[in-house]
Curated annotation (Swiss-Prot):
The gene is ATP5PD. Belongs to the ATPase d subunit family. The modification N6-acetyllysine is found at residues 32, 63, 72, 78, 85, 95, 117, 144, 149. The modification N6-succinyllysine is found at residues 78, 85, 95, 144, 149. This is ATP synthase peripheral stalk subunit d, mitochondrial. The keyword Transport applies. Gene3D superfamilies: 6.10.280.70. GO terms for biological process: proton motive force-driven ATP synthesis; proton motive force-driven mitochondrial ATP synthesis. The modification N-acetylalanine is found at residue 2. The lineage of its organism: Eukaryota, Metazoa, Chordata, Craniata, Vertebrata. It holds the Pfam family Mt_ATP-synt_D.
Length: 161
């Protein structure tokens, strides 16, 4: 049992080392060594515990009913294994995270396309020292003064000054 569970719970330490900050490298190496220690201890355990030789104890224990009593109690003992109620929740959260990451990546790619268009527009601009006011207003419409809405100088709201 220990060997089968161990194969499922491996950690990709190279990927883990890439995502942790530089100031936490010592903590991560400590965690890795502790994990390796526990993994080796768990791997050393047999899959099933060794069987108890009750006949040997019955022959060598002086009190007659003591071994029979222990055997009955030992066979009646059932260690409850807690149910795993969090794995399904973690898997569901992982699926949601994958969806949100994919959505974020697609939105980021769209933003990158917009920013590349804007960069291309900036590269194709007339140099600022050669621009006229009309060229500036054409390239950047937000700089144009609105003389109809604000007929008095500075032709923009006081809050923007």
């Amino acid at each position: 049992m220990a060997g089968r569970k161990l194969a499922l719970k491996t950690i990709d330490w190279v990927a883990f080392a890439e995502i942790i900050p530089q100031n936490q490298k010592a903590i991560a190496s400590s965690l890795k060594s502790w994990n390796e220690t526990l993994t080796s201890r768990l791997a050393a355990l047999p899959e099933n515990p060794p069987a108890i030789d009750w006949a040997y104890y019955k022959a060598n224990v002086a009190k007659a009913g003591l071994v029979d009593d222990f055997e009955k109690k030992f066979n009646a003992l059932k260690v409850p294994v807690p149910e795993d109620k969090y794995t399904a929740q973690v898997d569901a959260e992982e699926k949601e995270d994958v969806k949100s990451c994919a959505e974020w990546v697609s939105l980021s790619k769209a933003r990158i396309v917009e920013y590349e268009k804007e960069m291309e527009k900036m590269k194709n601009l007339i140099p600022f020292d050669q621009m006229t006011i009309e060229d500036l207003n054409e390239a950047f419409p937000e700089t144009k003064l609105d003389k109809k809405k604000y007929p008095y100088w500075p032709h923009q709201p006081i809050e923007n000054l």
